């Protein structure tokens, strides 16, 4: 079980906390599992409202454009056939549901594997708070994040009730804010570092993500 330092809003070490092995210490990270869950998550985010009109849905074209024989041209029955300009679209996209069925255990396991990868590369951080006091300060939040990591994309996990942290960090570019219950595999992977407030960290590790992988190793 590894440990990480707990930093104050000023960036100073105030203590340390252990990263539970069942969440941050998976023995073997499964890339196919992570890939499957991320693909499913991105697919579920698609609206699927794309729509083209078939020849039967396009307005007009009810009259035969010219007689069947004697013109020397190919026979045509409607000017709304796919080969005509203004005609219907053949095999075009239609509204559909792109979502895939992904078991909850699979989602939770993929998240643990992603967090393990970040923990192995020392990219999990815990802070007592984003700012000192209750007055929001974007400047103070920017200074803290600069001390935590030189990398740009940070995922900040804060408690729902920590309004000062939300207001301080929400306008910072490349800072994505989530609650502990919203933490997911995709957002962990697209972020360089994951920063927990201490309250959010305690809430997350005591939640439903504390489980055992089906392969037999703890995750």
Curated annotation (Swiss-Prot):
NCBIfam families: rplD_bact. One of its GO terms (biological process) is translation. One of the primary rRNA binding proteins, this protein initially binds near the 5'-end of the 23S rRNA. It is important during the early stages of 50S assembly. It makes multiple contacts with different domains of the 23S rRNA in the assembled 50S subunit and ribosome. Forms part of the polypeptide exit tunnel. One of its GO terms (cellular component) is ribonucleoprotein complex. HAMAP family: Ribosomal_uL4_B. This is Large ribosomal subunit protein uL4. It comes from Streptomyces coelicolor (strain ATCC BAA-471 / A3(2) / M145). It comes from the Bacteria. PANTHER family: 50S RIBOSOMAL PROTEIN L4 (PTHR10746), LARGE RIBOSOMAL SUBUNIT PROTEIN UL4M (PTHR10746:SF6). Residues 43-101 are annotated as: Disordered. One of its GO terms (molecular function) is rRNA binding. Part of the 50S ribosomal subunit. It holds the Pfam family Ribosomal_L4. SUPFAM superfamilies: Ribosomal protein L4. Keywords: Ribonucleoprotein, Ribosomal protein, RNA-binding, rRNA-binding. Residues 61-72 have a biased composition (Basic residues). Belongs to the universal ribosomal protein uL4 family.
């Amino acid at each position: 079980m590894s440990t990480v330092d707990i930093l104050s809003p000023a960036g100073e070490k105030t203590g340390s906390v252990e990263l539970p092995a069942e969440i941050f210490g998976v023995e073997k990270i499964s890339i196919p599992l992570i890939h499957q869950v991320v693909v499913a998550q991105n697919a579920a985010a698609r609206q699927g409202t794309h729509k083209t009109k078939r020849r039967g849905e396009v307005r007009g074209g009810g009259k035969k454009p010219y007689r069947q024989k004697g013109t020397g041209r190919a026979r045509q029955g409607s000017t709304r056939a796919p080969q005509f300009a203004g005609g219907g679209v053949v095999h075009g996209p239609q509204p559909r549901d792109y979502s895939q069925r992904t078991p909850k255990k699979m989602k939770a396991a993929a998240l643990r594997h992603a967090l393990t990868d970040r923990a192995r590369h020392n990219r999990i951080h815990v802070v007592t708070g984003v700012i000192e006091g209750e007055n929001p300060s974007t400047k103070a939040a920017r200074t803290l994040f600069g001390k935590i990591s030189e990398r740009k994309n940070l995922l900040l996990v804060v408690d729902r009730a920590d309004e000062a942290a939300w207001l301080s960090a929400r306008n910072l570019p490349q800072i994505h804010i989530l609650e502990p219950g919203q933490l997911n595999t995709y957002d962990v992977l697209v972020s360089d570092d994951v920063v927990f407030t201490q309250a959010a960290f305690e809430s997350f590790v005591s939640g439903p993500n504390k489980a055992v992988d089906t392969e037999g190793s703890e995750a």
